[in-house]
Amino acid sequence: MTCRTRFAPSPTGYLHIGGARTALYCWLEARRRNGQFLLRIEDTDRERSTQAAIDAILHAMDWLGLDYDEPPVYQTQRIERYNQVAARLLAEGKAYYAYDSKDTLNAMREAALRTGEKPRYNGAAREANLPYRDDPNRVIRFKNPHTGTVAFDDLIKGRIQIANSELDDMVILRPDGYPTYNFAVVVDDWDMNITEVIRGDDHINNTPRQINLYHALGAPLPTFAHLPMILDEQGAKLSKRTGAADVMQYRDSGYLPHALINYLVRLGWSHGDQELFNRQALIDLFQINDVNSKAARLDMAKLGWVNQHYLKTDDPATLAPPLVWHLEQRGIDVSAGPAPTDVILALRERVQTLKEMAEKAEIWYCPLQRYDEIAVAKHLKPGAETALLHARTLLAALPAWTVDNVDTALRTIATTLEIGMGKVAQPLRVAITGTQVSPDIAYTVYLTGRNEALKRIDAALIKISTA
């Protein structure tokens, strides 16, 4: 049987980090087994579902490289199908109409709570065989078995068993003809021929109810795998403040999609002590039943380390487009400065994110705005003008503006003046960048460009003379 998995987000919000991990695990399991990965948009919550959220989910999936093998399925386009299946269950005596008012249902709930029982529907309409009538309280309920147990072997959690007496007759169709979650997902997974249902363990209590629906429909039962939660760094439930943000905010913060993928896969799965995987290695090695049953903790320092690894090792040509995007987000005209690939080579060892790289790269695309006064006091003081004047003369006279020629010129100054290279580099570094920290000084000057470098040296000389 061909493996078919699905990711089924609800577009009531954006794709968060937990959902992205679920999508990744579904995608990897399908790819490893040469199966199909499908996407379903569970958009039946008409009050909260938005097109903006749908678009954001699709965009995030594309950014992460989690391609799906068939067009997305939208639940709102399948309302007629849910009604057909509900009608079949009614005809077979496996479901029934109920017309209980909200007050009646609330009274049932309160009575159960007073006696210490779990709130549940008491089955008042189960045997009444009530006919259809136009009523705002009309629902269709599934006749859950009263006896026996529901048992299944979860690929992550192991054997799970619950008595049917613990389950009530759940609503499957609302008064407006829209399905409930538990009903829709069973019909969808059946129609989509899903063989492995991989989802968060917040759905595990729904599974016995869904299994009974599968049996009632005579539908083949998929295998279930319920993923543990992702907690924040303090071990608490994720919030937007502690990491449960829109996946695209990770892009906006400067993380690479393959770095995020590499990090996410390790939140619950491992292959020995190996930390870094390319995508093909993940496809070859990942197995859903190897996922840990315990909750994983977010570790932003580890994500930063993984991201920096790829910044250091990826081809600069592949890093250039996302760097350009980050530069443009800062309002920078990339054509006004050095080639992005050169910037990457200059900064890749010094930053963890592309956002940080873009911030540091501003010195090569924008006029120098200010000086670090501590750096000025230390390096732009009387006496420093000698090295700067020599630098200006030699840099202006270079036959070609190359990093090697710049480096040779600066070393010539140190030799001529019989001073250490630091006495040349540090005043020049402050003149060019406004700070006393930068990449290699020759490379820093080269990326600034001849005309801009000379202009900044002139400004530094004026600053020294007026100090």
From Swiss-Prot:
BP GO annotations: glutamyl-tRNA aminoacylation
Single GO cellular component term: cytosol
GO molecular function, one term: glutamate-tRNA ligase activity
Pfam families: Anticodon_2, tRNA-synt_1c
Main localization (coarse): cytoplasm
Chain residues that bind ATP: 240
Subcellular location: Cytoplasm
Motif extent ('HIGH' region): 9-19
Quaternary assembly: Monomer.
Family: Belongs to the class-I aminoacyl-tRNA synthetase family. Glutamate--tRNA ligase type 1 subfamily.
Function of the protein: Catalyzes the attachment of glutamate to tRNA(Glu) in a two-step reaction: glutamate is first activated by ATP to form Glu-AMP and then transferred to the acceptor end of tRNA(Glu).
The protein's name in its UniProt record: Glutamate--tRNA ligase
Organism annotation: Xylella fastidiosa (strain M12)
Gene this chain is encoded by: gltX
